């Protein structure tokens, strides 16, 4: 470089800092990738349990709900999994049982009557 020892030292420190930042970024990417893989495995396990515990009709109903109300479908899935894990369901949940579960989870909606004079 310019031959000045301070400049050379400063350049060396910059290079070290760049290397540290690269290593930190690569470590963060690996950690993020591991988290994504874990989430994907959890989702696959959940889907396998749902497939095991729901009939085709009940699964179709749940998928239809997921398209319009994803949060509500997630809540229903959690309820189905909890019922299955606790052993409160014998066999598979059919469409009628799924309707009942959805009715229980559905928030009470208030209806308003408007009277015109």
Swiss-Prot record:
Residues 11-21 have a biased composition (Basic and acidic residues). SUPFAM superfamilies: Double-stranded DNA-binding domain. It holds the Pfam family dsDNA_bind. The keyword Cytoplasm does not apply. The keyword DNA-binding applies. Keywords: DNA-binding. InterPro entries: DNA_bind_arc, PDCD5-like, PDCD5-like_sf. GO terms for cellular component: cytosol. Residues 1-59 are annotated as: Disordered. Signal peptide: none annotated. GO terms for molecular function: DNA binding. Belongs to the PDCD5 family. This is DNA-binding protein VNG_2008H. It comes from Halobacterium salinarum (strain ATCC 700922 / JCM 11081 / NRC-1) (Halobacterium halobium).
């Amino acid at each position: 470089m310019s031959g000045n020892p301070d400049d050379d030292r400063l350049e060396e420190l910059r290079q070290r800092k760049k290397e540290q930042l690269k290593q930190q970024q690569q470590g963060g990417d690996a950690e993020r990738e591991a988290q994504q893989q874990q989430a994907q495995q959890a989702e696959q396990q959940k889907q396998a349990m749902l497939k095991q515990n729901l009939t085709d009709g009940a699964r179709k109903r749940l998928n239809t709900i997921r398209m319009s109300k994803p949060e509500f479908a997630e809540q229903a899935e959690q309820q189905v999994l909890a019922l299955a894990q606790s052993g409160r369901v014998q066999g598979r949940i059919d469409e009628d049982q799924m309707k009942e579960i959805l009715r229980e989870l559905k928030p009470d909606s208030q209806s308003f009557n408007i009277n015109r004079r």
